[in-house]
Amino acid sequence: MGDNHQATLSNDPAANAPDAAAADKGKGKAADEPSLEMSMDEEEDSDESEAEEMMADDDDDDDHDNLEPISEANIISGGRRTRGKTIDFQEAAEKLKAEDEMDDEDDDDEEFQPNDEDMRD
């Protein structure tokens, strides 16, 4: 600082050692914020143009609402989804039900008796 009590700000990375090291590491400087010197007329114009752009985007969505029905020729038949294996869904449901009943028997906590000797200090 000089005698006039003003700080000198510099954009030179060599003037400040930590900034110089950061510049060498590939970290860029922050982008300047857009200026706020826009007049009121320009602001209103940009709002209107944004609204028009939003309406144009909505028009694109309307094109997709008129979908054609699915052609049956595109539906895969012949069990290709199960790789040729036939599945008996009733048998699979019974098997799952039996497994669930076996798991319920293992979860009985009524028979559990804690060992109080292990809990003492």
UniProtKB/Swiss-Prot annotation:
Compositionally biased spans, kind Basic and acidic residues: 22-32, 85-99
Keywords of the record: Chaperone, Nucleus
Location of region: Disordered: 1-121
Subcellular location: Nucleus
Domain of life, per lineage: Eukaryota
InterPro entries associated with the record: Histone_chaperone_domain_CHZ
One Gene Ontology term, aspect cellular component: nucleus
Compositionally biased tracts (Low complexity): 11-21
Biased composition (Polar residues): 1-10
Major location category of this protein: nucleus
Biased composition (Acidic residues): 39-65, 100-121
Pfam families in UniProt: CHZ
Function description: Forms a chaperone-bound H2A.Z-H2B complex that acts as a source for SWR1 complex-dependent H2A to H2A.Z histone replacement in chromatin.
Assembly and interaction partners: Forms a heterotrimer with H2A.Z-H2B, stabilizing the association of the histone dimer. Also, with a lower affinity, forms a heterotrimer with H2A-H2B.
Family: Belongs to the CHZ1 family.
Protein known as: Histone H2A.Z-specific chaperone chz1
